[in-house]
Amino acid sequence: MNIFEYFKKKDIDTVDASFYRKIAEWDSWYRSNVRKFHFYRVYGGQGTWTRCRRHSLGMAKKVCEDMADLLLNERVKITIGDATTEDFVQDVLRQNNFMTKGNEYQERKAAKGTVAYVPYLADAEVDDQGNILNGIVKINYLEAPNIFPLSWENGKV
């Protein structure tokens, strides 16, 4: 059973599977590996064909890299009005290697259509009243094939 069959069985409405086929197509362009473009056959005579791979400059990847470098680079500064909050956020971003991973995932966003940065609390301790005593804020980085929106309203997931 694939994920879409599971969603259907549980009566969960999500993005149609055809969208994920498009993501796979975009990824093949990004990797310079489009089946009907980068691969072709050459007739060798006497009924023989040779399968060939077209050379590529990898321009789709280059465009995605350039887009990512414009969006998230060393000149980008994330600022918050409150100094204490800004220090905390900067520390979380540094601990999660955000400038490097964020740029890498901006490239993947340009290639596949979307990415998600998912913050979560690791190694958390909770008291009897449900208050969080401590923990480490971490960030999961997800790319389009691993994102399945379960609900959205007015464009917000």
Regions found by a protein language model. Name each.
Residues 1-142, 147:
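Extended, helix-rich architectural segments
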Residues 150-157:
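Short, intrinsically disordered, charge-balanced linker/junction segments flanking boundaries
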